[in-house]
Design a protein with these regions (language model features):
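Ubiquitin-like/PB1-type beta-grasp interaction modules and other compact soluble beta-rich domains
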Residues: 1-75
Length: 76
């Protein structure tokens, strides 16, 4: 199982703080979360970390990995 943690607007919009999922890639994680009602546009623009390291949709996952998804921060 993969542990997925959501932060920022992703957490607020979905009501999901942490979820256990079965997925082989980050892309699969994003597809599963979209099925929970998170808008794909929000998922596509998020910051992705796997086990604390920068990742992308093509990143492969193994059992026990932690995926962190954060809304990008903007300001001025």
């Amino acid at each position: 199982m993969i542990t997925v943690k959501l932060y920022g607007l992703l957490r607020i919009e979905s009501g999901i703080r942490e979820k256990q999922l079965k997925a082989a890639t980050v892309k699969e994680v994003l597809e599963i979360l979209a099925a929970y009602g998170i808008p794909p546009k929000d998922l596509n623009g998020c910051v992705i970390l796997v086990n604390g390291n920068s990742a992308n949709k093509r990143s492969k996952l193994t059992d026990g990995d932690t995926v962190v998804l954060m809304s990008p921060v903007a300001g001025g």
